[in-house]
From Swiss-Prot:
Family as reported in the entry's similarity comment: Belongs to the thioester dehydratase family. FabZ subfamily.
Gene that encodes the chain: fabZ
Reactions listed under catalytic activity: a (3R)-hydroxyacyl-[ACP] = a (2E)-enoyl-[ACP] + H2O
Compartments, as annotated in UniProt: Cytoplasm
Name listed for the protein in its UniProt record: 3-hydroxyacyl-[acyl-carrier-protein] dehydratase FabZ
Main location class: cytoplasm
EC category: lyase
Record keywords: Cytoplasm, Lipid A biosynthesis, Lipid biosynthesis, Lipid metabolism, Lyase
Annotated source species: Aeromonas hydrophila subsp. hydrophila (strain ATCC 7966 / DSM 30187 / BCRC 13018 / CCUG 14551 / JCM 1027 / KCTC 2358 / NCIMB 9240 / NCTC 8049)
Superkingdom to which the source organism belongs: Bacteria
Residues of the active site: 57
HAMAP family: FabZ (MF_00406)
Gene Ontology MF terms in the entry: (3R)-hydroxyacyl-[acyl-carrier-protein] dehydratase activity
Amino acid sequence: MTTEKKSLGIQEIMDLLPHRYPFLMVDKVENYEISDERKTLRAIKNVSFNEPIFQGHFPAKPVFPGVLILEAMAQATGILAFTMVGKPSPNELYYFASIDNARFKRPVGPGDQLVLDVEFLKERRGIAKFTGVATVNGEVVCTAELMCAKREV
């Protein structure tokens, strides 16, 4: 297999994921690499003050919820998975199955740009395992191990 390094815009992301505003958590894919040695993807989530979640979390000191950072990571793994195996059919969904060892290092707020780095580790019985690291300005804000499953609906 040859090495691929590519980027994806929002329309290409929307072709791969069923999520839409306000729950689409990936704005662009800066690059991904699929080779025999590694399968990785770097995605971007721009955190805007206009995010609906900031109306209640928290109005005086907006904090982007950790669970949404994890959702952004999970969406990045879905994009990576579908770039590895091809675009999903209309009756396929990619489910976030589990998360292990999630750690939050610092809060994320309006104006931050989340850089989401995910790596495919292995697949067994239709369940894929990934690692994920989210950073802001080079500083780690969240790490986790994620498992996802592609299923017919």
